Amino acid sequence: MKVLVTAAWPYVNSVPHLGNLIGSILSADVFARYARLRYGKENVLFVSGSDEHGTPIEIEAIKRKVNPKELTDQAHEYDRHLFLNVWKISFDNYTRTESEIHKKFVREFLLKLTKYIKVSEDEIPYCENDKLYLPDRFVKGTCPYCGFEDARGDQCDNCGKLLTPSLLVNPKCSICGKTPVFKKTKHWFFDLSEFNDKIRGWISSSNEMPDNVKSVALSWVGEGLKPRSITRDNKWGIPAPFEGAQDKSIYVWFEALLGYISAVIEYFERKGDQEKWKEYWFGPNIKSYYFIGKDNIPFHAVILPAMLMASEEEYHLPDVIAATEYLLYEGQKFSKSRKIGVWIDEAPELMDVEYWRFVLIRLRPEEKDTNFTWRETVRIVNTELNDDIGNYVNRVLSMVNRYYSGIVPEFKIDILDDNDRKIISLINETPKVVGDLFEKGKLKAGTEEMLKFVRECNAYLNMKAPWDLYKSGKEIELKNTLYIGTNSVKTIAILLYPLMPSHAQKIYEMLNMGNIENEKWDVASTLSVNPGHKIGKVNVLFKKLEPEFESKIKDKLEKIRKDIEKIRPTLLK
């Protein structure tokens, strides 16, 4: 089994905020780390990259009178550093749409779709002041569906509807603010209508696709898919490969989706293997996972599979598109201009990155929009991490040290009570329950099952009271309790690893069990810490956030924000 894990490509015109992070990159990383333990590192590939073409970058470059690539070079390296070095995202390949391999692949792939591509004249807004056509974000106006007054020419950020510039009410040029005129210009259209029935059949027959993705895709095909322009009049983009389209570029969404393929090709080309990429894209023994925000569902559940079908090359279609709803910040939408939210270069200055990872997965908006609050953050860190997980690990291993000099005691399987059997049963069953939820893209739900297990373990330890067993000389019961407890700690470490890899490794070091990255997920279900094994030194695993953390956060964030702003690249300020 080959497992392809992808995260929606972050657009480089701004630093991602916490909502962006949980919507794609972090969720994908948690799943990729799980998948490597479950399927083996050699069978899992995790890719993404910087999405850097299109109108927002071109507009910014025009305003600053610089080449767009000057801006995206800086932004790509900044984001890449944050993901790989600060947040420790475990990409196998984090690339960019300016990659020569990507640009070459996109042009070659689109030429395979010519059977489904039509040329037609389209009316596009044109700014007579700036002497520019205004595709997509070059034009803004009022959304015809919800009345939002700052809708873009390609999509309304308020209601999520995909738009064309001609649909906007009272359109204005994004550069100078003047009202454009509409001019006819030739464009190339991908005829999605040819795939209406195929998309419906594919999405309806899937037993793994989440309901929110199915609903959006079926709504689209229910309304009838229509041809969509695949070219733009932008200069900043991949040149269109079609005959007569020399002055056109490829619409950013069509080319960015193909980055999932080109990133795999690039990864193996760097390793000197020109053919191995096909193992992740062709054949039945593949599972593919796409982690995205809900506003990207139409592109991944309709346009991407339609392009793959149109190539007539038997590309593997998406298995699970895990699309989150929106994460709010203290009840409001994230907003850079209004300074509402926390961005990923600010967050590590406020709290340990792995605390953030755990908190964000606990708040992951899987079924509905969820609300990030500092109060809930403090509760999660202080109660769930410190009190529930950290204290349990510390208590069990400290008692193994205290009562048995760090040697895991012998286990009498024929002398067990119902409470012992219950925890052993949970050790056997919980990893599968968590794994099954992860496989469905339900990371928050899987983490809740892990915490239920931790709470049961705490209740077991409190009920057994090993300190009393020791005092009363109940040696066999004490040994069984601490043997089971030590094995439950190992289970917790493996379940925690995808969310908090460094802290899971710390638990493994306390257990003296080597590198957890080399462990197998199934080991979490076993009693594999054997009697006679010598555990390591026991250390404090987590630290509580101080009582005044919440009350001081606003001032602290303001100071950090001023410092961070000074080091951000030009495009991201």
Swiss-Prot record:
Binding site for ATP: K336
Top-level taxon in the UniProt lineage: Archaea
Listed EC numbers: 6.1.1.10
Cofactors, names only: Zn(2+)
Major place of residence: cytoplasm
GO biological-process terms attached to the record: methionyl-tRNA aminoacylation
Gene this protein is translated from: metG
Keyword line: Aminoacyl-tRNA synthetase, ATP-binding, Cytoplasm, Ligase, Metal-binding, Nucleotide-binding, Protein biosynthesis, Zinc
Subcellular location field: Cytoplasm
Annotated Zn(2+) binding sites: C143, C146, C156, C159
Similarity comment: Belongs to the class-I aminoacyl-tRNA synthetase family. MetG type 1 subfamily.
Motif ('KMSKS' region): 333-337
GO cellular component, one term: cytosol
Protein name: Methionine--tRNA ligase
One Gene Ontology MF term: ATP binding
Chain's role: Is required not only for elongation of protein synthesis but also for the initiation of all mRNA translation through initiator tRNA(fMet) aminoacylation.
UniProt cross-references to SUPFAM superfamilies, sorted A to Z: Anticodon-binding domain of a subclass of class I aminoacyl-tRNA synthetases, Methionyl-tRNA synthetase (MetRS), Zn-domain, Nucleotidylyl transferase
Bound cofactor: record note: Binds 1 zinc ion per subunit.
HAMAP family: Met_tRNA_synth_type1
Catalytic activity, reaction form: tRNA(Met) + L-methionine + ATP = L-methionyl-tRNA(Met) + AMP + diphosphate
Entry-linked InterPro entries: Anticodon_Met, Met-tRNA_ligase_1, Met-tRNA_synth, Methionyl/Leucyl_tRNA_Synth, MetRS_core, MetRS_Zn, Rossmann-like_a/b/a_fold, tRNAsynth_Ia_anticodon-bd
Motif ('HIGH' region): 10-20
